[in-house]
Every structure is written in structure tokens, then in C-alpha cells.
Amino acid sequence: MAKDFINGKRTQFGNKRSHALNSSRRSWKPNLQKVTILVNGKPKKVYVSARTLKSGKVTRV
């Protein structure tokens, strides 16, 4: 399963609750993008969440 290279975000799991409070499993997936960034001075392709990109924690090469 892919995860965010910077924050470590990955798919979260929980329950979907109906109006009658029946439960069924569901998942929340982060918006991961494959980007090239500099890691230790060398370009590397990694998965980064869109939120991390927007916050400016990483810059594309």
C-alpha cells in the first residue's frame, strides 16, 4: 500500500453508518501524487499527498 513519503499518511479504515445505524466497512484514501523531489541532493520519485505539496513542505525538481 502506498504512503506519503513525508508524513507517512496511508489509507484509513472505519465504518460507514446508515440511517438505521447499520455499519459496513469503508476506507478513506489520501490524495497521493507521484512526484520527483530531491532526497539527499539526488532526484527521487516518491508518493506525496496533495496536501503536503500545497503546504510547501516539498518542492518538485
Swiss-Prot record:
It holds the Pfam family Ribosomal_L28. SUPFAM superfamilies: L28p-like (SSF143800). One of its GO terms (cellular component) is ribosome. InterPro entries: Bacterial_rp_bL28 (IPR050096), Ribosomal_bL28 (IPR026569), Ribosomal_bL28/bL31-like_sf (IPR034704), Ribosomal_bL28_bact-type (IPR001383), Ribosomal_bL28_sf (IPR037147). Residues 9-25 have a biased composition (Polar residues). Residues 1-26 are annotated as: Disordered. Keywords: Ribonucleoprotein, Ribosomal protein. It comes from the Bacteria. GO terms for molecular function: structural constituent of ribosome. One of its GO terms (biological process) is translation. Belongs to the bacterial ribosomal protein bL28 family. This is Large ribosomal subunit protein bL28.
